[in-house]
Curated annotation (Swiss-Prot):
Keyword tags: Protein biosynthesis, Translation regulation
Family matches, as SUPFAM superfamilies: eIF1-like (SSF55159)
Record bears the keyword Ion transport: no
InterPro entries: DENR/SUI1_TIF, SUI1, SUI1_arc, SUI1_arc_bac, SUI1_dom_sf
Lineage of origin: Archaea, Thermoproteota, Thermoprotei, Sulfolobales, Sulfolobaceae
Name under which the protein is recorded: Protein translation factor SUI1 homolog
Entries under NCBIfam families matching the protein: PRK00939.1, SUI1_rel
CDD domains named in the record: YciH_like
Length: 100
């Protein structure tokens, strides 16, 4: 996070404020051959930060996935579990929306 956006606040507080401002949408799409893909959108940050979050989610869910166009895509239907993991990462529950 850039220091000038947080007005001299410590980096930890700045990071938490940034997480509280994000509205995250979690949805599942059906792809070819009936395969399901969980898509997480609304996370702001650089590609490196998104890849770090995706990597952590993939290892905890034992699933493959990728980062494309600012969205995290995970193989399989992991909506509820992803919400739990994002809350453990510090994202507020009220900002995480599961789209059915």
């Amino acid at each position: 996070m850039s220091d000038n956006l947080c007005g001299g606040l410590p980096p930890e507080i700045c990071e938490q404020l940034n997480k509280e401002e994000q509205f995250i949408k979690i949805k599942v799409e059906k792809r070819r051959y009936g395969k399901e893909v969980t898509i997480i959108e609304g996370l702001s940050g650089s590609d490196v930060e998104l890849k770090k979050i995706a990597s952590e989610l993939k290892s905890k869910l034992a699933a493959g996935g990728t980062v494309k166009n600012g969205k995290i895509e995970l193989q399989g239907d992991h909506r509820e579990r992803v919400k739990e993991l994002l809350m453990k990462m510090g994202y507020p529950e009220s900002n995480i929306i599961i789209i059915e």
